Every structure is written in structure tokens, then in C-alpha cells.
Amino acid sequence: MKLLKTVPAIVMLAGGMFASLNAAADDSVFTVMDDPASAKKPFEGNLNAGYLAQSGNTKSSSLTADTTMTWYGHTTAWSLWGNASNTSSNDERSSEKYAAGGRSRFNLTDYDYLFGQASWLTDRYNGYRERDVLTAGYGRQFLNGPVHSFRFEFGPGVRYDKYTDNASETQPLGYASGAYAWQLTDNAKFTQGVSVFGAEDTTLNSESALNVAINEHFGLKVAYNVTWNSEPPESAPEHTDRRTTLSLGYSM
């Protein structure tokens, strides 16, 4: 059975687990191996969702959902993604984040490609009313086998930040990202993604995930996300944000 990487939305009662520390925004890493040369069908889409509720002496709830959709041409790939998460404790919201983005890839050769991507994020509990990022550049597909896949890309970009105190700034940045996938078995796949946005306040994002297929369409995903910000907003002074999730995924 082929395992597809799971990503946003089916409402799940199977359970989820979440752990986070307030800090930086922007913990999404694009880990889909979007090489059109290895695509087996013209479209791949995934949905993930997780929910955790606790009642009694302590009342809390956490919800997360994300989705990724990719369309393949002969030498091109187009992707859209989005994610949402929020946490409440004793009927008070303690975190709320929404993000969306798009990406295009054009293969120059079997190994070299050009890319462009744009993303939007709001994470007001971590000090960001809005964060918009636009990047473009060159990438290299070093591995693209049935067991191991690895790509690395880099390029210039620009970022617009609007903070919860209504201050804003626009600054150029340098972008670099690597994504690795290891097909452990027919039903299990490990992925690791790292991205760096270098500017006056540099952001580093990492996602480690294990996807286990239940059947052709459903699977479980365990993911650990870390985001580090060199200069977080004053309203959210922690430099590092960590989140662990267990979610049920649906592959289209």
C-alpha cells in the first residue's frame, strides 16, 4: 500500500495531542516532494485534523487542521496549503493561528528547478496580526528514489509584518529550505523539513513527522514542529515555539 503524506482536514474523533510554548509565529514547512517528474497522478491532496478535550477540575480544548493540494503537469507543479490551530483553557482562548499559501515549481532538468511561493499568516497571541512572505529561487533535487527523497532550495524574498500593536515593517530576506522523505515500509513514511528566513529577525522552522497508513485513504500523522525567532515581538518574548500533534489524515 502506498503511503501518501497526510495534510489538512477531516474532523477527527480519534484524538489528538498538542503541546506548545508561546513564542514565534510561522511554523509551517513545505515538505511535499512536488517533483513533477516522479508524480504518479495529476493531483494529490491530503487532509489532517486533530482534537483534544479535557473536562473536570481543568477544562481545556485544542484543535488543529491543515491541508495540502498539488497539481502536476509535465514539468510543473502547483500547490496550495492552509492550516489552523487554536487552544482554549477554562473557556479562555490562549492561542489562535491561521495560515495559507501557494507554490509553483518548474523543472529545468531532472535535478534542477525554479520555484516561487507566497504565504499569509495571522498569529495574534504571538504578536503578529499579519505576516506575508514572498520568495523565489533555485532548487536542486538530490534524491528522488522510491525509498529516499531529498531536495534543497534557496533564493531572495520579501516579508511584511504587522504586529498586534499596529506597528508594521517590510524587509528583504534570504530564504533556504531542505526537505527529506524516507519510505520506511509500505505503510510508514518519515519526513523532515527545515526552512530559514534570514532577515533582521531571522526565523527557523522545523517539522519532523511520521505518517502511518491505515488503509488506502486514511492514516495517522505524528508531527513535532519547532519555530525559533531571533527577535520576537515584545508582546510574545519567547524565542522558541514547540508543538506536538497527533492527527487523523485523509488522502484524496
From Swiss-Prot:
Keywords: Signal. Residues 1-23 form the signal peptide. InterPro entries: DUF481. It comes from the Bacteria. Residues 231-252 are annotated as: Disordered. The keyword Signal applies. GO terms for cellular component: cell outer membrane. This is Uncharacterized protein YdiY.
